[in-house]
Amino acid sequence: MKRVKLTVAYDGTNYCGWQVQPNGLAVQEVLNRCLSEFLGTETEVIGASRTDAGVHALGNVAVFDTDARMPAEKFSYALNTRLPQDIRIQDSCQVPEDFHPRFQETIKTYEYKIYNRQFPDPTKRLYTYFYYYPLDVQKMRQGAGYLIGAVSYTHLRAHETSQDLV
C-alpha cells in the first residue's frame, strides 16, 4: 500500500465546497468518484483544507491510499484526462504512509480581490467583488496592518469528530 499526495487546483463556482455534502456536489466527491472509477476500487481522498461553496483553490493538498502499481507521479496525468475542466491535479507524488495533509506545517494564503470601477466587468464576476463606491485606500492599508503576522484560527474551527482524528 502506498500513499499518494495530490496538489489540487479548482474553480469552486459549481461546487458546494471541498467536503462531501448531502445537498450538493463537492470537489472531494468528484475526486473520489474519478479515482474509484480509474482504480476499480472504492477510493477516498483526505484533504488538507476545506473550502466553502464557490471558493477556489490553487494548491489544496489531498492524499489517498492505493495498491496500484502505477508510479505516484503518473496519477496527475491519468486523473486530469478524466476530471472536469474546473478541477486539475497540479502534481502527484508518493509520501510516507503516515503523512496527513491536515497536520503538516503549511501556510495558507487567502486572496480577496475588489474590482472598483463604475461598471462591473462580466469576465471578472466570478473572481472579484465589485464595489462601485470610492475606496479609502489609506484606511484599508491601515486596517490590513492588523492582519499581518502568524495567526492561529483554531478557535474558529468546529469541534473535532472521530473523522477528524487519525
Task: Tell where the protein language model's regions lie, with residue ranges.
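Catalytic/RNA-binding core of pseudouridine synthases
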Residues: 1-150
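Conserved small/polar residues in nucleotide/adenosyl-binding loops
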Residues: 154-161
